[in-house]
């Protein structure tokens, strides 16, 4: 296991994107680790470093990104996802609780008549839904472009109302955060959509050729495309203690997606298909974090205390041992193995 700085990780990711730029519109980075391993911190620092470099390039070069108008080349990301029958839409709008423990349920879609976007729904209903829009993204008003974005797994926590419909709702609430309490069906469907965008081939403006010289950031700025749909991803509202739809957006300006979560390498149910889905794109880097239990315990216990989930540090430790530690051991014992999964540390 090697210690990596945000600067070093950013160098690796940008080199990888440079190698893939002629064949892959975007690349994916999967960051996996148990509670307290620092995966969120690493992901945030990585994206901040990459975005800072890109915006510094724009400022110093005096250039602006070029968003190609390819409106006649719209990409149907949701092709192949079955549609809800009209009679089922009432159930969707009123909770959609009947499939909450069905790990084999295939997500379905419907068209939002208000804006024409497609909404993809799994076992968690609308709170865990994905929205896909074929609309050109707006340029940021402050010109703060984010070519790297985090896509967290947290938005696929089943809502508390959905946990109420488990066969054993008391146990479901007690073990919230364990694999069965996630909408893994729609999380996998999101990964399939994102992987599909990775395989889109970038196109250069008509006045450019592959022989033109330039930096990586020059080439990125020249190959943004309106034809790449925007994908709205649920997040988690800690104040409400429930998922929140559309909290994150992966749009045409996003060239690096950083997926972070506990179970993205878990060799169980729908989770086990996430890594192969991205592996098939030939455009993914996978980092796994693993620290000693003592370090994890102290980090998570302090986090529980600071967030109000525990009244004392001792209560935070107890909460860690009753839930987080069980999840951490499950990840360790049932983790997919592959030669290209790299172990890193942020001690």
Swiss-Prot record:
<comment type="similarity">
    <text>Belongs to the YFH7 family.</text>
</comment>
<keyword id="KW-0808">Transferase</keyword>
<keyword id="KW-0418">Kinase</keyword>
<feature type="binding site">
    <location>
        <begin position="33"/>
        <end position="41"/>
    </location>
    <ligand>
        <name>ATP</name>
    </ligand>
</feature>
<keyword id="KW-0067">ATP-binding</keyword>
<protein>
    <recommendedName>
        <fullName>ATP-dependent kinase YFH7</fullName>
        <ecNumber>2.7.1.-</ecNumber>
    </recommendedName>
</protein>
<dbReference type="GO" id="GO:0016301">
    <property type="term" value="F:kinase activity"/>
</dbReference>
<dbReference type="GO" id="GO:0005524">
    <property type="term" value="F:ATP binding"/>
</dbReference>
<dbReference type="InterPro" id="IPR027417">
    <property type="entry name" value="P-loop_NTPase"/>
</dbReference>
<keyword id="KW-0547">Nucleotide-binding</keyword>
<comment type="function">
    <text>ATP-dependent kinase that could be involved in endoplasmic reticulum membrane assembly.</text>
</comment>
